UniProtKB/Swiss-Prot annotation:
Its EC number is 2.7.1.167, 2.7.7.70. Pathway: Nucleotide-sugar biosynthesis; ADP-L-glycero-beta-D-manno-heptose biosynthesis; ADP-L-glycero-beta-D-manno-heptose from D-glycero-beta-D-manno-heptose 7-phosphate: step 1/4; Nucleotide-sugar biosynthesis; ADP-L-glycero-beta-D-manno-heptose biosynthesis; ADP-L-glycero-beta-D-manno-heptose from D-glycero-beta-D-manno-heptose 7-phosphate: step 3/4. This is Bifunctional protein HldE. PANTHER family: BIFUNCTIONAL PROTEIN HLDE.
Length: 478
C-alpha cells in the first residue's frame, strides 16, 4: 500500500476520556534493601508525562493536528501539571474539575531501563454528572473531523452512548479505544480498536485467522460498527469492515522496549489521519507504522511527522537523505539484513530537471533502496568546466534527498565513484545515457560481487546544458 503523509495541520480532533498523569522515577540500582528482598533505587531523575486520554491528545498534537481534550480531574498539583504540560505541546484542555476526587496518577519506578513497580493513586469518577462533558462535546463538534473516546474505565465515559449519538448526529466519526467486556455500550461507533486480549475477552479465544475474522465480523454486525481494528502486537493489525475483505498489516516494530501508551498512539494517528481526509485503510497503515516507532521508545511517547514519514518509507532505523560514506555503509548493512536490494547511481545533478527525476524514479523501481552518489564541486568543475557547478554540493544533495525515489545521497571527491562503489558494492549499479555497461565506473567490482549493471535512458531534450543555454539566450534578449 502506497500512502502519502497527509497535511495534519488541516485536521481537528477532540479526545474525550480518562486523563491521568504518568510519573516516572529513574535511578541506578546497586544493592538489595536490608529491610526486605527488594532492590534499592537511588532516584536521580523525575519525569511527569500526560497519560491515558491525555497521551492520545498529545499524539495528535505531535503530528501538527488541532488537538482538544476533555476529561475529569481533581483540583490538585497533578491537574495543574497536566494543564501545563499539555499546553506546552498545543493541546487545548477543557477539563471538568471535580473537587471531591484526586487526579488519576500512576507512578512508575525504573532502573536500567526496567520497570520495577507501578503505584496507582486514584478514585473512580463513577457517578459524576455527565452533562458538562456532553456540553463540551457539542461545542467542539463543528470544529473537528473526528472524535476519540479513550476509555480506561475510570468514569469519564460512563455515558458513552450519549456521546456516540451526539457525534453521529453531527456527522463526525467516533473512534473508541474500548475497555472491559461490554462492547454493547459502544454500539454504533465508527471504529473500535481493541487489542487482541481485549478482543478475545469478548469474542473468545481464536485458534486460527479464519476464526478471528469470523468472530470479529460478528461483533461488527452485533454492535452496528462501521469497522473493527484489532491490534495484535507482534502480529500486526487486522481491519474488519462489512462487505470488504479483511486487511492485515504486519508489524513494523524493529525492537520493543515499552508498550506503554502504544494503543494511544494508534488511535491518535488513526483519528488525525481520518480528520485530514485519508481513507480508513490508509489511516490504519499510518497508525501501524506509528506503533512500530513508539514501542521502540521508553514510557508513554508520541510520534512526529518526520518519524512517521521515515517509518512508512521503511527507513526509521537506517535514516535517509544526505549521509557521509561511513553513515551510508551502516545504513546499507541494516537494509541488507532485512533482505533489501540496493540500487546505486551517480552524477553531478547540477540543475535538477524532469529528466533526472524520471531517471531516478525508474532506477528506484529496480530495487528497494536507491543511493545517489554526487560529484563534489571540485570534481564537477574538472568534468564540466570552470563555470560549473551552478549549484554548490550541499544544495544539490538537499534537493536530491527530498525526492521520493531517493533514499540516500552521498558525495565523492574523485572524478569517478569507482572507489565508493567498490566500498558499497550495490546489488544493481545504474547509469543513464549511451554508455555500454563495461564503460561504467565500478562495473567490474559490482559484477565480481555477483551484482548487475544496467543502463537507463534519459528523457529526450532534458539536460542541464540545454537549461543553461536557454537561460543565457533569454538573458541576452532582455
Amino acid at each position: 500500500m502506497k500512502v502519502t503523509l497527509p497535511d495534519f495541520r488541516q485536521a481537528g480532533v477532540l479526545v474525550v476520556g480518562d486523563v491521568m498523569l504518568d510519573r516516572y522515577w529513574y535511578g541506578p540500582t546497586s544493592r538489595i534493601s536490608p529491610e526486605a528482598p527488594v532492590p534499592v533505587v537511588k532516584v536521580d531523575t523525575i519525569e511527569e508525562r500526560p497519560g491515558g486520554a491525555a497521551n492520545v491528545a498529545m499524539n495528535i498534537a505531535a503530528l501538527g493536528a488541532g488537538s482538544r481534550l476533555v476529561g475529569l480531574t481533581g483540583i490538585d498539583d497533578a491537574a495543574r501539571a497536566l494543564n501545563a504540560k499539555l499546553g506546552e505541546v498545543n493541546v487545548k484542555c477543557d477539563f471538568v474539575s471535580v473537587p471531591t476526587h484526586p487526579t488519576i496518577t500512576k507512578l512508575r519506578v525504573l532502573s536500567r531501563n526496567q520497570q520495577l513497580i507501578r503505584l496507582d493513586f486514584e478514585e473512580g469518577f463513577e457517578g459524576i454528572d455527565p452533562q458538562p462533558i456532553i456540553e463540551r462535546i457539542q461545542l467542539a463538534l463543528p470544529k473537528i473531523g473526528a472524535l476519540v473516546l479513550s476509555d480506561y474505565a475510570k468514569g469519564a465515559l460512563a455515558h458513552v452512548q450519549t456521546m456516540i449519538q451526539t457525534a453521529k448526529a453531527a456527522g463526525v466519526p467516533v473512534l473508541i479505544d474500548p475497555k472491559g467486556t461490554d462492547f454493547a455500550r459502544y454500539r454504533g461507533a465508527t471504529l473500535l480498536t481493541p487489542n487482541l486480549s481485549e478482543f478475545e475477552a469478548v469474542a473468545g479465544r481464536c485458534k486460527t485467522e479464519e476464526e478471528l475474522v469470523e468472530r470479529g465480523m460478528q461483533l461488527v454486525a452485533d454492535y452496528e460498527l462501521s469497522a473493527l481494528l484489532i491490534t495484535r502486537s507482534e502480529q500486526g493489525m487486522t481491519l474488519l469492515q462489512p462487505g470488504k475483505a479483511p486487511l492485515h498489516l504486519p508489524t513494523q516494530a524493529q525492537e520493543v522496549y515499552d508498550v506503554t501508551g502504544a494503543g494511544d498512539t494508534v488511535i491518535g494517528v488513526l483519528a488525525a489521519a481520518l480528520a485530514a481526509g485519508n481513507p480508513l485503510e490508509e489511516a490504519c497503515f499510518l497508525a501501524n507504522a506509528a506503533a512500530g516507532v513508539v514501542v521502540g521508545k521508553l514510557g508513554t511517547s508520541t510520534v512526529t511527522p518526520i518519524e512517521l514519514e521515515n517509518a512508512i518509507r521503511g527507513r526509521a532505523d537506517t535514516g535517509f537523505g544526505v549521509m557521509t560514506e561511513e553513515q551510508l555503509k551502516k545504513a546499507v548493512e541494516l537494509a541488507r539484513q532485512r533482505g533489501e536490494k540496493i540500487v546505486m547511481t551517480n552524477g553531478c545533478f547540477d540543475i535538477l530537471h524532469a529528466g533526472h527525476v524520471s531517471y531516478l524514479a525508474n532506477a528506484r523501481k529496480l530495487g528497494d533502496r536507491l543511493i545517489v552518489a554526487v560529484n563534489s564541486d571540485a570534481s564537477t568543475k574538472r568534468l564540466k568546466g570552470p563555470t560549473r557547478p551552478v549549484n554548490p554540493l550541499p544544495q544539490r544533495m538537499i534537493v536530491l534527498g527530498a525526492l521520493e525515489a531517493v533514499d540516500w545521497v552521498v558525495p565523492f571527491e574523485e572524478d569517478t565513484p569507482q572507489r565508493l562503489i567498490a566500498s558499497i558494492l550495490p546489488d544493481i549499479l545504474v547509469k543513464g545515457g549511451d554508455y555500454q555497461p563495461h564503460e561504467i565506473a565500478g562495473s567490474e567490482e559490482v559484477w565480481a560481487n555477483g551484482g548487475e549493471v544496467k543502463v537507463l535512458n534519459f528523457e529526450d531534450g532534458c539536460s542541464t546544458t540545454n537549461i543553461i543555454n536557454t537561460i543565457k539566450a533569454n538573458a541576452s534578449k532582455s
